UniProtKB/Swiss-Prot annotation:
Protein name: NACHT, LRR and PYD domains-containing protein 9C
Gene source species: Mus musculus (Mouse)
Keywords (A to Z) from UniProt: ATP-binding, Cytoplasm, Immunity, Inflammatory response, Innate immunity, Leucine-rich repeat, Nucleotide-binding, Repeat
PANTHER family listed in its UniProt record: NACHT, LRR AND PYD DOMAINS-CONTAINING PROTEIN 12, NACHT, LRR AND PYD DOMAINS-CONTAINING PROTEIN 9
GO CC terms of this entry: cytoplasm
Highest taxon above the source species: Eukaryota
Residue ranges of coiled coil: none
Localization, UniProt: Cytoplasm
Domain NACHT: 143-465
Chief location category: cytoplasm
Family: Belongs to the NLRP family.
Start and end residues of each Pyrin domain: 1-92
Gene designation: Nlrp9c
GO biological process: blastocyst development; inflammatory response; innate immune response
């Protein structure tokens, strides 16, 4: 039987005579060739019924079926059917549009409330509207657009307007036949569905069949909002599906749609907030951004004169503009609505409801108080408190369950009656969403959920869903972004004398000291070294402290932390960091990342008006100047991946320069890290901070240094006041010429550890360094030269240096093309008794087993060499056998041997086992990434269990072995308390000594 979704086509087939139907099938063969489709065999078509042919067409050609059929109707002289089908399809599409128009007209007028004429709103969103048209201007290519912006900036309102305009016939008419709008958080309680079911839920009864609708996916747009409130993780998945009919877990359906596995030719328009942006964008294909940057001054004016009568609106606007902090809040549409609503109530009650400087929490409180007074008047505070508490319980239960749409059972369970619901709707605390209820704005749910904890009493009934305050604080500060991300500011904002005083007339005494104590207690636990949980997003905390603004409490919180890592992405972030960090008197270590946008000198219209850009520049400069005051008191300043301009560098220099009131002896800075820094300047910064007597460590990894800047650096290092001992200049684009400059200056410096990894020094650069090493004044102890484009020729220079240098103990030559001939030269130097080298790193140097004879000779005669790393070389079993002979020699003193990734097999395990038992000094052996099997592992484990084995670290990836082998290793570890079997055992130490750092992201 034909599927009901395909009935639309069948009804036209029924109107064909048998002769016409037969002719239709014959022509179908040619039509398949015309459309370049894989043909259905004639045997399948010849005797098939009309019902079966419909099924076959939709199965094999779902996207071309109507184009083919309409064309074939013409060829069998049934133009009437072709015309009739087109008219009927168009009528059904228009009926869907009409249905959506009525629905979104109701949503626009009843639930959106922009409080301004459409022409004024259209002026406000003109830039975003043009961006939308530009993205979807193509007639055929699928596109993905994301509407971005902080909370309350009008993203959902913009999408609703776009949906209404499409349904009204004024937007993207030639581009999309169907536009579907879904608030994805409404699916939070749906565990399984199909895309077909999801679409069907939006279709009126008179619509086309799903097969017909989806037969042309390039003419379909999905509008999706509410990702911030979605409780599913829509991560990159491999278990995706392209079948829109198939029922799947809800997150799989959404992921399949977003990742273009399901209906890849459709287009997407998504609303993403702060929480969801970083999670969803990686799933999308070539997303283009539409930025909602908030209301301009002109837009605020439009809003005020529309919300109030014109004369009163003008007066309100003027008053708001005089109040700069309040006017700043007005750029957020939801905040402007609350402010105007409160002012309207104050106007009619002849009360001054908003003072000169109010926080977001205070604005919400004033709005709620105004609404309560207008409805409940002078009723008892006990009664009003009871009513408020039911609303707060609904809100907090929803937050913990990640529910934002409530049904009648949710209201009943939380003691909200029908009459209560009517009151809350009138007060604009709640709004109707279809057959359900939502909070009027998401921030109201966050506010009421937070207020629950202030109203909570010990005698209250236990609620199994609602977590404790410490649990909630853990969700906010120690875990990934979640549904509580935006609510956190209200905890700090309500916990102020001002807000509690505002609440008192309506709801009686409310204590906030207990909440503050809980916050302090929890944050203190995060700051302890032994605590497994850490402060993941300090920026969240900074904005909370700005919301609080009570100096004593803010200082009390910030003084809990000695180390903080923070990412600064815009001017607001910098202001929040400046406010909070200046109150952290116990702060010692600051890791600061400043993104390009913060100090950019080029205006990008995507991020707002030129006027706002200039204001941001002004405030960023002021905040940076203030923030830099604390640098002199830090022990560690990490400016990794910071984007600076010339003026910012000047401020940084000034902050680290001595003054009559701030002599050099007062500065505490010991470690400075400037990795991957842009616009580093001309090097004058070195002359400033290298004077600081406490500064011992400087890391510039990934920051490009010209020859002139290198010369400035070296000149400063040579200065008598400079005390730098560790200098890490990896990946700084230092040439062999710059290396020559450096070698000349470093001879008389105090530098003991020098890393030049990942620089194109070449053999010529090493020649200069070796001249430095041969100078008796050189005190260098560690030299890191991995990835420096060296060959065996460099080893000839190093040979001479090793013979004469009395201080060098660590030499890293990893990942250079040294070959056996180069290592043999080094071995000749190591055989001399006066060679002081203790560690030699040679991983990835293109060595073979041939060089192991010379290395073995070194191991048996050199008493100083304690560490030898030969990983990632073609040593093989034959080479290891020679090395093991040396390890068994009584004069071998090596303690640490790296043989990871050396193409070893079981054949060398017997030799290794003997060496483990015989060598009294060997403490660490790395065999990671070698193809050892169970039998070889058994031999090693037997040796590890031997009483003469001194090994305390074995490098192996336990997870790569069979279950039986893993059991063996676990048993050995259990028996030998001092033994650790580790994967990548030395990576952390190697990166630290090389000074290698990662480009900043939120995880490092």
């Amino acid at each position: 039987m034909v599927d009901s979704s395909s009935y639309g086509l069948l009804q036209y087939f029924q109107k064909l005579s048998d002769e016409e139907f037969q002719r239709f099938k014959e022509l179908l063969q040619k039509e398949q060739e015309k459309f370049k489709l894989k043909p259905l065999s004639w045997t399948k078509i010849k005797n098939t019924s009309k019902e079966d042919l419909v099924t076959q067409l939709y199965t094999h050609y779902p996207r071309q079926v109507w184009d083919m059929v309409l064309n074939l109707f013409l060829q069998v002289n049934r133009k009437d059917l072709s015309t009739m089908a087109q008219i009927e399809r168009r009528d059904k599409q228009n009926k869907y549009k009409e249905f959506m128009k009525n629905l979104f007209q109701y949503i626009w007028t009843s639930e959106t409330n922009t409080y301004m004429p459409d022409r004024s709103y259209n002026t406000i969103i003109d830039r975003q509207y043009k961006a939308l048209l530009d993205i979807f201007d193509s007639e055929s290519d699928p596109a993905t657009a994301v509407v971005l912006g902080t909370r309350g900036k009008g993203k959902t309102v913009f999408l609703r307007k776009a949906m209404l305009d499409w349904a009204s016939g004024v937007l993207l008419q030639n581009r999309f036949q169907y536009v579907f709008f879904f608030s994805v958080f409404s699916l939070n309680n749906t565990t399984e569905l199909s895309l077909a079911e999801l679409i069907s839920s939006k279709l009126p009864e008179c619509s086309e069949t799903l097969d017909d609708i989806l037969s042309n996916p390039k003419r379909i747009l999905f509008v999706l909002d509410g990702f911030d409130y979605l409780k599913f993780d829509l991560e990159l998945r491999t278990n995706l599906c392209n079948d829109w009919r198939k029922r799947l877990p809800t997150q799989n359906v959404l992921s399949s749609l977003l990742q273009k596995i399901m209906l890849p030719e459709c287009s997407l328009l998504l609303e993403l907030g702060e929480s969801s942006c970083s999670k969803i964008i990686p799933l999308l294909q070539n997303p283009r951004e539409i930025i909602m940057s908030g209301l301009s001054e002109q837009s605020i004016y439009f809003y005020c004169v529309s919300f109030f009568k014109i004369q009163l609106g003008v007066e309100v606007f003027k008053d708001l503009k005089k109040n700069e902090p309040l006017f700043t809040l007005c750029s957020n549409p939801s905040m402007l609505w609350m402010i105007c609503s409160s002012l309207m109530w104050g106007h009619y009650s002849r009360e001054e409801v908003i003072s000169s400087s109010e926080s977001t929490s205070a604005i919400h409180t004033i709005f709620i108080m105004s609404a309560f007074k207008s409805i409940f008047g002078l009723g008892s505070s006990k009664y009003k408190r009871f009513k408020l508490k039911t609303l707060c319980t609904l809100a907090v239960e929803g937050m913990w369950k990640q529910v934002y749409v409530f049904d009648s059972e949710d209201l009943r369970r939380n003691k909200i009656s029908e009459s209560d619901k009517t009151v809350w709707l009138k007060m604009k605390f709640l709004q109707i969403q279809g057959n359900n209820i939502m909070f009027y704005h998401s921030t109201l749910q966050w506010y009421f959920a937070t207020l629950f904890y202030f109203l909570k009493q010990d005698k209250d009934t236990y609620h199994p869903v609602i977590g404790s305050l410490p649990q909630l604080l853990g969700e906010i500060y120690a875990h990934k972004q979640n549904q509580w991300t935006h609510a956190q500011t209200f905890f700090f904002g309500i916990a102020t004398k001002h807000v509690i005083t505002l609440l008192k007339p309506c709801f009686g005494n409310i204590s906030f000291k207990t909440i503050r104590q809980e916050i302090i207690r929890y944050l203190k636990s995060l700051s302890q070294p032994e605590c497994n949980e850490k402060l993941v997003h300090p920026k969240k905390l900074f904005f909370c402290l700005i919301e609080n603004q009570e100096e004593r409490f803010v200082s009390q919180v910030m003084n809990l932390f000695e180390e903080i890592t923070v990412d600064i992405s815009d001017s607001d972030d910098l202001g929040a960091a400046e406010y909070s960090l200046l109150r952290a008197s116990k702060l010692k270590n600051l890791h600061l990342h400043i993104q390009k946008k913060v100090f950019s000198e080029i205006h990008d219209p995507e991020y707002g008006s030129l006027e706002n850009f200039k204001l941001d520049q002004k405030f960023s400069a002021i905040n940076w100047t203030m923030l830099s005051i604390l640098f002199c008191n830090l022990h560690v300043l990490d400016l990794g991946s910071c984007h600076f301009n010339k003026k910012v560098i000047e401020v940084l220099c000034n902050s680290l320069s001595p003054t009559p009131n701030m002599p050099l002896t007062v500065f505490k800075l010991q470690r400075l890290l400037c990795s991957f820094m842009t616009n580093f300047g001309d090097g004058s910064l070195f002359c400033t901070f290298l004077q600081i007597p406490q500064l011992k460590y400087l890391n510039l990894y990934g920051t490009d240094l010209s020859n002139d800047v290198v010369e400035m650096l070296c000149s400063a290092l040579k200065c008598s006041t400079c005390r730098v001992e560790e200098l890490l200049l990896g990946k700084c684009d230092i040439s062999s010429e710059a290396c020559g400059i450096m070698a000349t200056f470093l001879i008389n410096s105090k530098v003991k550890h020098l890393s030049l990894v990942e620089n194109p020094l070449k053999n010529k650069g090493v020649m200069f360094l070796c001249k430095m090493l041969k100078d008796p004044s050189c005190v260098l102890e560690s030299l890191m030269l991995s990835y420096c484009c060296l060959t065996f020729i460099a080893c000839g220079h190093l040979y001479e240096a090793l013979l004469s240098n009395k201080h060098l103990s660590l030499l890293d030559l990893g990942s250079n093309f040294l070959e056996d001939i180069g290592v043999n030269l080094l071995c000749e130097a190591l055989k001399y008794p006066n060679c002081t080298l203790k560690e030699l790193w040679l991983p990835g140097c293109y060595l073979t087993s041939e060089c192991c004879e010379e290395i073995s000779a070194v191991l048996t005669c050199n008493k100083n060499l304690k560490t030898l790393k030969l990983g990632n070389n073609n040593i093989q079993d034959t080479g290891v056998k020679r090395l093991c002979e040396a390890l068994c020699h009584p004069k071998c003193k090596v303690q640490c041997l790296g043989l990871d990734m050396c193409e070893l097999s079981n054949d060398c395990c017997e030799d290794l086992a003997l060496a483990l038992i015989t060598c009294n000094t060997l403490k660490s052996l790395n065999l990671d990434w070698n193809a050892l099997h169970h039998s070889g592992l058994v031999m090693l484990c037997e040796a590890l269990n031997h009483k003469k084995c001194k090994l305390n670290m074995l490098g192996l990836d336990k997870s790569s072995f069979s279950e039986e082998s893993q059991t063996f290793l676990q048993a050995v570890e259990k028996k030998n308390n001092n033994l650790n079997v580790l994967h990548f055992p030395w990576v952390e130490d190697e990166l630290k000594k090389r000074g290698v750092r990662l480009v900043w992201n939120s995880k490092n």
